[in-house]
């Protein structure tokens, strides 16, 4: 006996907790509700909320509305037609005597008017009641009524008020807690923004022929040590600093301007600059492209090499010109140079034998 009581107590606690922290959404299911005037009536609920479907209030009305609310699939809602697996949510028909008695006893003290019939749907992913309806976050559930609104058409299976009064509803279930909005891209720091401005400024200066703005001298003040090293590298210098880069590479200003002029004229190929002979021996030694100094070294190396040569291999083939007038060329192999001597010795030996 103790276990059933514990089970009922647990259910009561769950329901109490849900009702305490949940929101209640009331849907008045009648044709006069302005919600059904929208083309696609819809609501959003969260896990733990309560959705209450309220029947039309026919008290004191001569022509009341009598209908049944069903939970259907998306296709059935679009077609306004019931399927075999459609689930009845609430039936708003003529109350029987038993229903009238039950509802009368449920009235609060001091009230004599019966409230409209209603049913509450608890939005939860796990239902402690066996075979109870469970809702999953991210899913959408659909409700329609195909009744005609008359007492005799309460069991109609197609169209009805779903078509004539657009009495249909889409309910999307969200998670129990509001999902955080996708984090936007992190705001660029002041340094990144300044680097972007510098890049635009540099690109603009290059397009304008090397003209810089007034703040160009302070462009490197914000850079980190590693970025500063890259920024001061000659490969990344601005057009206005090319003269310094050329001087550091051993190229004179006149030569560099000549190259620039040839590039503007669209010339291609290789060329050699005319250099004046440097009179200072100290300056010649430090000139990285001193042609005369390199030529002297090469001549000295060749001269020393010729003095040390003591043997030179005889070429395998010799090409010579025998008749200049006929321009006929012939060749002789070094391996056949001893052939006539061998023939003479052979003929002398034959004569001695015979």
Swiss-Prot record:
One of its GO terms (biological process) is regulation of cell adhesion. Residues 23-173 form the Ephrin RBD domain. Residues 1-22 form the signal peptide. Pfam families: Ephrin. This is Ephrin-4. Residues 175-186 have a biased composition (Low complexity). GO terms for cellular component: axon; neuronal cell body; plasma membrane; side of membrane. Glycans are attached at residue 30. Belongs to the ephrin family. GO terms for molecular function: ephrin receptor binding. The gene is efn-4. Residues 173-196 are annotated as: Disordered. InterPro entries: Cupredoxin (IPR008972), Ephrin (IPR031328), Ephrin_RBD (IPR001799). PROSITE patterns: EPHRIN_RBD_2 (PS51551). A lipid is attached at residue 335 (GPI-anchor amidated serine). Disulfide bonds join 55-92, 80-162. Its main location: membrane. Residues 336-354 form a propeptide. It is found in: Cell membrane. Regulates the formation or stabilization of cell-cell contacts at several stages of epithelial morphogenesis. In early embryonic development, involved in ventral closure of the epidermis. During male tail morphogenesis, regulates precursor cell sorting together with mab-20 and allows the formation of distinct sensory rays. Probably acts as a ligand for lad-2 to regulate axon guidance of several neurons including SDQL, SDQR, SMD and PLN neurons during neurogenesis. Keywords: Cell membrane, Developmental protein, Disulfide bond, Glycoprotein, GPI-anchor, Lipoprotein, Membrane, Neurogenesis, Signal. May undergo proteolysis by metalloprotease sup-17 to give rise to a soluble form.
């Amino acid at each position: 006996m103790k276990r059933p009581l514990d089970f009922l107590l647990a259910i009561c606690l769950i329901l109490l907790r849900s009702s305490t922290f949940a929101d209640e959404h009331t849907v008045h299911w009648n044709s006069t509700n302005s919600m059904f005037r929208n083309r696609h009536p819809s609501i959003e609920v969260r896990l733990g909320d309560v959705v209450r479907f309220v029947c039309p209030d026919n008290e004191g009305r001569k022509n009341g509305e009598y209908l049944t609310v069903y939970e259907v699939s998306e296709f059935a809602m679009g077609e306004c037609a019931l399927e075999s697996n459609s689930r009845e949510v609430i039936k708003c028909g003529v109350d029987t005597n038993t229903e009238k008695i039950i509802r009368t006893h449920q009235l609060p003290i001091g009230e004599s008017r019966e409230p409209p019939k209603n049913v509450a749907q608890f939005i939860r992913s796990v239902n402690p009641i066996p075979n109870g309806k469970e809702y999953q976050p991210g899913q959408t559930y659909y409700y329609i009524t195909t009744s005609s609104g008359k007492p005799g058409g309460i069991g109609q299976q197609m169209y009805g008020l779903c078509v004539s009064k657009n009495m249909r509803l889409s309910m999307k279930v969200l998670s129990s807690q509001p999902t955080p909005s996708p984090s936007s891209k992190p705001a660029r720091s002041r340094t990144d923004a300044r680097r972007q401005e510098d890049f635009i400024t540099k690109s603009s200066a290059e397009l304008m022929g090397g003209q810089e703005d007034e703040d160009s001298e302070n462009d490197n003040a914000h850079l980190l040590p590693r970025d500063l090293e890259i920024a001061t590298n000659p490969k990344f210098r601005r057009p206005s600093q090319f003269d310094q880069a050329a001087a550091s590479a051993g190229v004179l200003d006149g030569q560099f301007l000549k190259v620039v002029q040839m590039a503007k004229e669209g010339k291609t190929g290789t060329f050699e600059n005319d250099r004046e002979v440097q009179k200072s021996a100290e300056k010649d030694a430090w000139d990285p492209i001193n042609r005369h100094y390199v030529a002297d070294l090469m001549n000295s190396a060749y001269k020393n090499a010729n003095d040390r040569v003591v043997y030179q291999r005889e070429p395998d083939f010799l090409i010579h010109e025998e008749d200049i007038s006929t321009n006929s060329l012939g060749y002789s192999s070094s391996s056949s140079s001893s052939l006539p001597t061998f023939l003479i010795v052979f003929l002398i030996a034959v004569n001695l034998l015979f």
